[in-house]
Amino acid sequence: MIDYSQFPRKNILCVDMKSFYASVSAVTMGLNPLTCYLAVVGNTDRQGSVVLAASPALKKDFGIKTGSRLFEIPEDPRIHIVNPQMKLFIRVSTEITKLFYRFVPEKCVHTYSIDESFLDAGKEDPEEMAKAIQSSMWREFGLMCTVGIGDNMLLSKLALDLESKKTKSGIARWRYEDVPNKLWKVRPLSKMWGIGGRMERNLNRMGISTIGQLAKFPLELLEKKFGIMGNQLYYHAHGIDLSEIGAPLMQGQISFGKSQILLRDYTRSEEIKAVLLEICEEVARRARTHNKVGRTISLGIGYSKDELGGGFHRSKTIDLPTSITMDIYRCCLMLFNKFYSGKTVRSVSVTLSNIEDDVNQQLSLFEVDNEKRRKLGFVMDGIRSKYGSKAILRAVSYTPAGTALQRAGLTGGHKS
């Protein structure tokens, strides 16, 4: 039996904006987000386009939800069908994060996604804080939110996903003591945060169909079968999570970065490297635009939900600062080849930091063509600036793995 007294007990809030895209769109149109019928669709011109968000009333009365298709929405004059306004969504999300800073210090906020955040309430009453946040959210933005509260980040997320969205108050709290009664009965396994379809099938073949059965399965057998993921599965099934809400970067620190959630799972190294090159190109372009160069290059790889999430984030500091695409790419390749474990990838990020002004950089004896490559980057930037981002692309962008061509002109992967 797990001795929970050996583990930290915090007051973590997981705040989720209810039908965020649909609700923001409704408020912008002067509609009540709780009672109107509204769907945000990837592209209203394509009948097969995916529903990105549906208002609560549309879900309840018409059965239309995230993942439905445009052609499935009934032709009813009461239903509003709109394209996503990604710039607006990002702006509202940023303002909501600022609202959180009124309740807790910035270092106690972790933005998990555009519509979901974790807050460490410290010694404050977490339930009172949750109610106050809900009240402020409705008063200032006209938006509803649900809140999960837990002794750690995992329990707060589980309280959110599995209970708070079903309660009248929109608030639920899970403590370590609630795990046997609330978590262990959960089935199918994929209802639990962090367990994807592939892992669920693997566990089912081992005779595990509930979280309770997973919690009681021998730890050594799980570790033998799944390695470190087996250890994580076991302890998550007991509600144990030692994740910390990370401190933010120092105010004023400059870096240039780009992160991308891929439109599908990438399993082949060559495909991942193609996307990586595109991202390095964009990071280098941003640095050049500001006449900056950087010495520290960071690579982040996020694994698919089917792989239990996770991933790695590693950095390397080079001798000569750069804003040259291939310099950044070579460094990222080195990090990728060293730390990538062969799992399915769903997100990639690259950051250039340790920034300084781009003025008469010292030429390396082994990089005599540095200045030519540097000037080439500026020429390519100029062409894109004048004729559009699709005017000149690297060959990888025209392969099935490339994303730059499709994402050109989009915000967050969708229409602006």
Curated annotation (Swiss-Prot):
The annotation note on the cofactor reads: Binds 2 magnesium ions per subunit.
Indicate the secretion signal residues: none
User: What Pfam family is a match, any one?
Assistant: IMS_HHH_1
Which positions are tagged coiled coil? none
Q: Does the keyword DNA repair apply?
A: yes
Gene Ontology MF terms: damaged DNA binding; DNA-directed DNA polymerase activity; metal ion binding
Q: What is this protein called?
A: Putative UV-damage repair protein UvrX
Which Cys pairs are S-S linked?
none
Gene3D superfamilies for this protein: 3.30.70.270, 3.40.1170.60, 5' to 3' exonuclease, C-terminal subdomain, DNA polymerase, Y-family, little finger domain
Q: Which GO terms describe its biological process?
A: error-prone translesion synthesis; SOS response
Highest taxon of source:
Bacteria
Q: Which UniProt keywords apply?
A: DNA damage, DNA repair, DNA-binding, Magnesium, Metal-binding, Nucleotidyltransferase, Transferase
Q: What cofactor requirement does the entry state?
A: Mg(2+)
Concerning InterPro entries, the annotation shows: DNA/RNA_pol_sf (IPR043502), DNA_pol_Y-fam_lit_finger_sf (IPR036775), DNA_pol_Y-fam_little_finger (IPR017961), DNA_polymerase-Y (IPR050116), IMS_HHH_1 (IPR053848), Rev_trsase/Diguanyl_cyclase (IPR043128), UmuC (IPR001126)
Q: Which residue intervals define the domain UmuC in the entry?
A: 12-196
Q: Where along the chain is Mg(2+) bound?
A: D16, D115
Residues of the active site are E116
Task: Name the family.
Answer: Belongs to the DNA polymerase type-Y family.
Q: PANTHER family attached here?
A: DNA REPAIR POLYMERASE UMUC / TRANSFERASE FAMILY MEMBER, DNA REPAIR PROTEIN HOMOLOG YOBH
Identify the coding gene: uvrX
Presence of keyword Transferase: yes
